[in-house]
A protein has these predicted regions:
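Accessory helical-bundle/CTD segments and flexible terminal tails appended to RecA-like ATPase motors
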Residues: 194-203, 210-217, 222-225, 240, ...
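Inter-lobe coupling/hinge segments of SF2-like helicase ATPases
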Residues: 1-268
Length: 352
């Protein structure tokens, strides 16, 4: 609203929007009285009808499924453009980019004065070393995120919980630790986050609820429990919660001793790179690149002709050649034999 002309009607639609406001916004959208709308998953609902949807922007696109993205863009018909934004593209997205269905712009530069985040891995048995490091950071007036996968202790899953970790840390750093998770009321969450922003607390023990949408420049350490249980894109997003100020930021991945080989590879990828595209490429090699013709986000497809992992340069060259032909060639009759073969082939079974 601060950027755009005041004459442009801009609205927000989320779970917090009250019933009366929702009805008004939905009606105004349909009547073309709202020109720009910001929203959560609430926008995907069938009752949300746009008068003339021309442009969809999906931020943190890895949080949305393929069907959801298509459902939203389809609300605009054939004239709707789609912009996806993500720090870590998921494998299927990367593959579609290689195939030319998406144009990609890469912003590799960091904002001024930001340093690369240093990522370490530590075994759970080395918790004393981690606590010692945290104590030093707090003494230097820095703040810490401590992320756990569960809210409460589970008998079925051997994962760290925020309640247990909060209790542990509160004894070591009394009065300096705050607790945050999804079951806390929204108003209370905002109070906790504001108190952390204003440095009332030095440690915030949280679930992955902090993954997106927060910016605390003074927080320069994040510790992630059971890090091997998270996907690479989520770990990369969590790590991005720190390193937003001028000081050196650190990410510590807490691990069990009995890691699988695949888990070790994923952890090493994260330790070796802060580049979202590099991470997504390595993730694609590990998990597969998704079902190009369907809705699967990952999983290996056995290409007999070529595949995006090993033949990326070939696909990029082919895309350039197609664009050249479209622009320069007036007589395409010489390509008819190739087109005939394509038409006759069972393209899905012959190539995939």
């Amino acid at each position: 609203k601060n950027i755009f002309n005041k004459n442009i009607s801009i609205e927000l639609l989320s779970s917090k929007t009250n019933t009366g406001e929702k009805k008004t916004i939905i009606k105004n959208l349909k009547d073309n009285k709202v020109k720009m709308i910001f929203g959560t998953h609430a926008i995907f609902q069938k009752k949300i009808i746009f008068s003339n949807l021309g442009f969809v922007i999906i931020d943190e696109q890895h949080k949305f499924g393929v069907r959801q993205r298509k459902l939203l863009s389809d609300k605009g018909g054939n004239n709707c453009d789609l912009l996806l934004m993500s720090a870590t593209p998921i494998p299927r997205t990367l593959t579609m980019s290689i195939y030319g269905d998406m144009d990609v712009s890469i912003i590799r530069e960091k904002p001024n004065n930001r340093k690369e985040i240093i990522t370490y891995s530590k075994l759970d048995s080395k918790i004393d070393e981690v606590v010692k490091f945290v104590k030093k950071e707090i003494n230097n007036e820095n703040q810490v995120f401590w992320v756990c996968p569960l809210i409460d202790v589970s008998k079925k899953i051997d994962h760290e919980s925020v309640l247990k970790k909060f209790e542990f840390l509160d004894k070591l750093f009394p009065g300096k630790v705050a607790l945050l998770h999804g079951k806390i009321e929204n108003d209370e969450k905002e109070i906790i986050l504001n108190n952390f922003l204003n440095k009332k607390y030095q440690i915030l023990v949280s679930t992955t609820i902090i993954e997106v949408g927060i910016d605390f420049p003074n927080a320069n350490v994040i510790i992630i429990e059971n890090a091997n249980k998270f996907g690479l894109s989520q770990l990369h997003q969590l790590r991005g919660r720190v390193g937003r100020g001028k000081k050196q930021a650190n990410c510590i991945l807490m691990l069990k001793s009995n890691l699988s080989e695949n888990a070790k590879k994923r952890i090493n990828i994260l330790k070796d790179s802060n580049d979202g595209f590099v991470i997504s490429e390595e993730d694609m090699k590990l998990r597969g690149f998704g079902d190009l013709l369907g809705f699967k986000q990952s999983g290996i497809k056995n290409f007999r002709l070529a595949d995006p992992v090993h033949n990326e340069d070939l696909f990029i060259l082919a895309e350039k050649e197609i664009k050249r032909i479209e622009k320069e060639e007036t007589n395409i009759s010489k390509y008819k034999p190739l087109l005939k073969l394509y038409d006759q082939a069972d393209i899905i079974n012959d190539i995939v």
